[in-house]
């Protein structure tokens, strides 16, 4: 027998190398085979509910790292709730209608207008479902636990029917109307867009300063006066029908030197404008308030059939331009709102494809709208005072990445103004994480216009509206309920397969159709109405779910998207928000803080991460970042996270190995019988349990990450385990000292495995498979630990905090001795502590082997007054380090004066000899194999 065989060296097959890319799919297959999701739901049946509603990602292409951040975050929350005694199902969803799928088919050469519509829509449906399958596999590879076999998809007939019911309820309350207001118009998509479908980019535009000649000055201005206006969209001059001034702003009539014309500009902008126009000097002829100029008539710059009226508007500012805004009601929301008050013509001179129409004039007809600036300049002639290129933020279609325009076209709207205050009141009742989200959503709702819900596309849910012979729109409850029932049975495809009369209730009549003829709407709904009514199609209808949901969690862009649309529809129909709380997250950027794009080559694919590092590394990264703000990720950052993971894994491996002979049923030592340092570690660990429990409640994953890393590296590796191994290795296997520490080891191991399961489910499942004494087959079926408190806890923590200060001081003294070549390793040291009475009292109160805790072979405690001059001194304490006396025990590796060769061929100290002689009689009788001595 070898001497080292008398040591209790930890044994485990749990590997140091994780091998996550290969092992994770095996665990996922095992979970699926065991129906773990279903079993967890059955375990929690009847318990308090927690329902997170999944915002549906768009079903197109593989998932990106933003999807991963979102789904992993949701999974962490739902798993933690499920293991904490909540009935917490997770129904994933997909958004499956909309333009991107039409664009994919177009790229494949499929031409919608050249084929049967029903056939085209079926191709869209099949493509969408194929993308759902692709993304489902991607999400499952991340270890996300969900009801994957029963997701919700917005193309499902039941969902479409429930969406129609939401529309019908809003229509019944009068919240749906048709209007010709300007809307965001995407010429590249040939459709109206909602605010949530807009993104902004900085572009260069040519801005023009030009003048309208006064035609009727109303006794205030003479006819040789010109009113100066500014535009950044020259094409809209073709539809200009008014000039808007600020009613309380001051305007001057000035005559530049050498000019026979006089001009009107805002007083606050005159100096800057004079420089632009080359007016070296000018004479001020008069001053007027904007309100004085109301109803003055001017000539259109070139269209002699058009007069432009001076009107008043509160949106005019002195921030730029001339203080006078040319007003084209067909091309802007402010222009429309102020123009309709004065009954200005709503002229629209651009068609759905972005081409100038016939009523723009023969010089413009057929030209692309943003190519006509040279024509406008030519038509203005000497009325053009200046032009300049400006860089400004401009709206783009978020799908096609092309600029858009405001354009007045007949559209269907959902009113927001009718119940805006109700929505704002509901926002104030909602909990927001982070808290600034409340202000953001509140301001968006407060400032937004009505919601344009119609789209001039094919792939989507039809607007369930019929028209009588006299043009009256029909959307009564009877009609929408009937359409909803048809959609539920057949899917929305029936809208395109049947004539209007066959879609209406049997025997339906309307006074506007004396001949019984009806037509149907051909526009579809905005896809934000699809997902925005999911509270009804999912939370309000699916078994084991509830409405309102406890939580919506999405990226911060959803304040103007899903959070917004869901809130509007829910308040409109039921008077309350669809959620109790909102958690928003920042965007995922690359390692340099830049947006990811294919062109930059900086995209991080979750699938690539899973193949290289494993999904648990990506999950740990999610827990490591502050998602309240934008977060960064790169392969280098993931490499750093992987290193942290390795430290956690190897520490837990140590605990597994050193509890391999521990049976909690027979070997556990009661808290009252633990050693002082073991009690201290038990208290510290339970504080960690409390911290993690609270952080899960607050959805603060980063707090969990920091707390776990600190506990593993500082409290365990750098302190407790550093000296505990000298006990668990050296003391007799069944000794009280060893079982005390194993009790703490096992308690930490089991509980931290449970606590980490929501974040690292694959790793903790692997650990759990080595814990043969635990009853649950899978850790996911276990319950979260509950933090305990202990008598005199604060006093114990205070005493050990003081010891930690002493320990740091002792380590400095040992380091100085090491540098002076007095010792090599700390176990070569004889440490003398010269202590004040206060420190002596502390050391006595700790009731511990201080030499063991400081990892020195010998320790002496003396009076502070006896400290030599060359001692390493601190306030109330000093240290002297000398080389320990004696020989190194081959078993304990400590220097001990009792170390000597024993009759059984072991060069050991008296303490090790006693353990050997009591526990290994055969080895004592036969002698050990050859010693080094």
Curated annotation (Swiss-Prot):
It comes from the Bacteria. Belongs to the class-I aminoacyl-tRNA synthetase family. IleS type 1 subfamily. Its EC number is 6.1.1.5. GO terms for biological process: isoleucyl-tRNA aminoacylation. L-isoleucyl-5'-AMP binds at residue 554. It is found in: Cytoplasm. It catalyses: tRNA(Ile) + L-isoleucine + ATP = L-isoleucyl-tRNA(Ile) + AMP + diphosphate. Gene3D superfamilies: 1.10.730.20, HUPs, Ile-tRNA synthetase CP2 domain-like. GO terms for cellular component: cytosol. ATP binds at residue 598. GO terms for molecular function: aminoacyl-tRNA deacylase activity; ATP binding; isoleucine-tRNA ligase activity; tRNA binding. NCBIfam families: ileS. Monomer. Pfam families: Anticodon_1, tRNA-synt_1. This is Isoleucine--tRNA ligase. The keyword ATP-binding applies. A motif ('KMSKS' region) lies at residues 595-599. IleRS has two distinct active sites: one for aminoacylation and one for editing. The misactivated valine is translocated from the active site to the editing site, which sterically excludes the correctly activated isoleucine. The single editing site contains two valyl binding pockets, one specific for each substrate (Val-AMP or Val-tRNA(Ile)). InterPro entries: aa-tRNA-synth_I_CS, aa-tRNA-synth_Ia, Anticodon_Ile_BEm, Ile-tRNA-ligase, Ile-tRNA-ligase_type1, Ile-tRNA_ligase, M/V/L/I-tRNA-synth_anticd-bd, Rossmann-like_a/b/a_fold. A motif ('HIGH' region) lies at residues 57-67.
